[in-house]
Amino acid sequence: MKISNVVNIDDMAVAARRYLPRIAFDYIDGGVDGEAALARNRQAFDRYKLLPRYLVDIEKRSQATRLFGHDYAAPFGICPMGIAGFFRPGADLMLARAAARFGVPYVMSSASCDSIDAAMEQAPQTTWFQIYGTRDTNITMDLIRRAKALDVRVLMLTIDTPVMAKRERNMRNGFRRPMKMTPSVILQGLSRPAWTLRYLAKGGIPMMENWRPYAGEGATANDVADLFGTETPAPAQTWDVLKLVRKAWPGPLVVKGVLHPDDALKCLEMGADGLVVSNHGGRQLDSAPAPMDMLPVIADAVGGRMELLIDSGFRRGSDIAKALCLGAKAALFGRPAMFGVAAGGEAGACKVLDIFRQEFSLVMGQMGWTEVGQAGPDCLLDLANPLAPARHDDPVS
């Protein structure tokens, strides 16, 4: 499928499936265990219906959003995704440039295949940086030092990966470290020659550039990947890691992977500026609730004292609108962006962002919104707890 023929995110997934070998596509598309959480993330949006308001002048509509003291063009962005360069060489920087073009945040993963230095050189106003707690805290501290030196605006600490996840599609397809060229993997590569030629032209397994300095001089891509696999997950880490990061990082700090309201309050108490309500895209705990189910609970708990973002399952502009109504300041998405950059490079990433922008603009028009701050719980019908469409104090009933 040509990128020019893509009209929605599902189309872009089809385009990515046709370009990538199964081992690569399933790494992006798959979840943990039986993928119940993956399905639940999408189903959670169906609980809520948007209540449109008409006969409102919506000719001029602004998606402008302010996050952590900075202005962005829309209430969405690209969440951190590791090893994007495996799916298309240079993908991390393509995503960074696409986000900059659209004026929305791009959160570079510390497990990216391009460096945070390169991303900040090309997209300094919109690039954030994500880190994990590591067994050797010196690595975490040095990543923070580098981010500070580059004037990264926002640091994101991911906390929802205390152990490895059982991702069954990867197990079946042979996606493992170190990558072994089994007959099955070779056949998958032969079935997608365009991807395979690009992969081989760049020397095979891409380097995790942010981690290269910690693996020693002359380290190979597999050496660096092995180090990353040794240092993360860090199952012994506690709330002390947040205390350590907060002390070291002077700017806005966002904690990613929060689903429990008590954890949200603990993050607030320890000085976090924001949260990403997330179940890691259904990739860690198959019995975890959908973030959309927990967002209103967490929003109620923190009471506007920190900025809330959300990820996992976003495919439509209407999904973003529902999240804003429930208390999020912005929504992040990973798979759609990865599908786009895999299938069409930077143009594919831009296409994904444009789809979300256009769909959200249309939803704003239907809702009678001229700015994103007009989204609120009164704009939703909760099918699990139906309420009257109009409030009692509304002049039109």
Name each region found by the language model:
Residues 1-46, 293-310, 315-397:
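Alpha/beta catalytic cores of nucleotide-metabolism and tRNA/nucleoside-modifying enzymes
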Residues 73-111:
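Glycine-rich active-site/cofactor-binding loop and its immediate structural neighborhood
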Residues 100-122, 126-140:
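A gly/proline- and charged-residue-enriched helix-loop-helix capping module
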